[in-house]
């Protein structure tokens, strides 16, 4: 019997397009597919990029983003969604208005601000709109260290400072804050921070805060430059797990396992920061069966 569309888990990505395929909606849709979720997209901007960096950003009109979201929501339905690159305050407001229109609850906000090569993907004046318009609608927000600093207004050099930032960000509305540790090197005791590359085997700690408890998800840092799209992929995996009905903490752990596998088996493509391997997690699961 043909499976009805209403029974298929569906996830929407609202983000920019990456011509190199390693990040943005391309990474999100690959991740959804690998986790058996039907993927849909609303494009907010076209980026001209490859593994060497971003050479052009062309934001779409806010109305174009809103109409894409409305087309998906009014017909296909959305079990969970994630936002990525939103570029400016006008697009953020348009996206937030559509989320409110459909009263979607499983919302993952990846506050994309800076590309791997340092290019700006969110205008400075848009950070306030992100805090005020989008975070109150988020179930989960997934900043890296620099993004957490921008959202919280706090410098983050120690684990205690990361915890304080998580508290401040959660007060803006999201149910759970996940501050990713990929930009930091510290031990679980809250040591100092180094922004340099590190050898494999050094711990990387993602901090999860639900308003009552802090959870530290510890993994091994992988020594590779091929990490393009890690943030997009992590948040997409989290949204996919939520679309399938996973509880929040379970969804975070699924996303953590997915991105760990993707980084460990990352792809040596291009001449710069290559992409992660979106099929690595599925292949590992197949081996276990």
Residue ranges with predicted function:
Residues 149-150, 225-248:
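Short, small-residue alpha-helix embedded
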Residues 35-40, 214-215, 241-255:
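Phosphate-handling active-site elements
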Residues 2-13, 25, 29-117:
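Conserved N-terminal subdomain of the carbohydrate kinase-like
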Residues 17, 83-84, 119, 227:
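Glycine- and other small-residue-rich loops at beta-strand/loop junctions that grip anionic moieties
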Residues 8, 59, 249-289:
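Charged C-terminal helix
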Residues 78-82, 108-116, 142-151, 179-180, ...:
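Short beta-strands and strand-loop turn motifs
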């Amino acid at each position: 019997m043909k499976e009805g569309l209403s029974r298929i888990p569906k996830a929407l990505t609202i983000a920019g397009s990456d011509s190199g395929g390693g990040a943005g909606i391309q990474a999100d849709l690959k991740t959804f597919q690998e986790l058996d979720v039907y993927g849909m997209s609303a494009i907010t901007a076209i980026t001209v990029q490859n593994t060497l960096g971003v050479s052009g950003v062309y934001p779409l009109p806010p109305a174009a983003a809103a109409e894409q979201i409305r087309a998906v929501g009014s017909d296909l339905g959305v079990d969970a969604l994630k936002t990525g690159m939103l570029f400016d305050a006008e697009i953020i407001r348009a996206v937030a208005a559509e989320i409110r229109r459909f009263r979607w609850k499983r919302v993952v906000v990846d506050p994309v601000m800076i590309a791997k090569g340092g290019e700006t993907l969110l205008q400075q004046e848009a950070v306030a709109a992100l805090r005020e318009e989008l975070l109150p609608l988020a179930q989960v927000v997934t900043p890296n260290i620099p993004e957490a600093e921008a959202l919280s207004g706090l410098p983050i050099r120690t684990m205690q400072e990361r915890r304080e930032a998580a508290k401040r960000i959660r007060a803006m509305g999201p149910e759970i804050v996940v501050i990713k540790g990929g930009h930091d090197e510290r031990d679980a005791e809250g040591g100092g921070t180094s922004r340099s590359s590190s050898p494999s085997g050094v711990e990387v700690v993602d901090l999860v805060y639900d308003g009552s408890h802090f959870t530290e998800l510890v993994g091994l840092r992988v020594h590779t430059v091929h990490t393009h799209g890690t943030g997009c992929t992590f948040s997409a995996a989290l949204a996919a797990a939520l679309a399938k009905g996973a509880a929040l903490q379970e969804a975070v752990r699924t996303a953590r396992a997915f991105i760990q596998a993707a980084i460990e088996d990352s792809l040596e493509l291009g001449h710069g920061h290559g992409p992660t391997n979106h099929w690595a997690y599925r292949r590992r699961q197949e081996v276990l069966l």
